[in-house]
Amino acid sequence: MKVRASVKTMCEKCKIVKRNGVVRNICTNPKHKQRQG
């Protein structure tokens, strides 16, 4: 899980999702997991 100021998709399978006011990146590749913070 990477915590970043700007969350961007890293591949074509990445999805940007907003959960409880937190922007997250979800992907099949665990290295692409991101959260805005």
UniProtKB/Swiss-Prot annotation:
Keywords: Ribonucleoprotein, Ribosomal protein. Belongs to the bacterial ribosomal protein bL36 family. Pfam families: Ribosomal_L36. This is Large ribosomal subunit protein bL36. The gene is rpmJ. GO terms for cellular component: cytoplasm; ribonucleoprotein complex; ribosome. GO terms for biological process: translation. InterPro entries: Ribosomal_bL36, Ribosomal_bL36_sp. GO terms for molecular function: structural constituent of ribosome. PANTHER family: 50S RIBOSOMAL PROTEIN L36, CHLOROPLASTIC (PTHR42888), LARGE RIBOSOMAL SUBUNIT PROTEIN BL36C (PTHR42888:SF1).
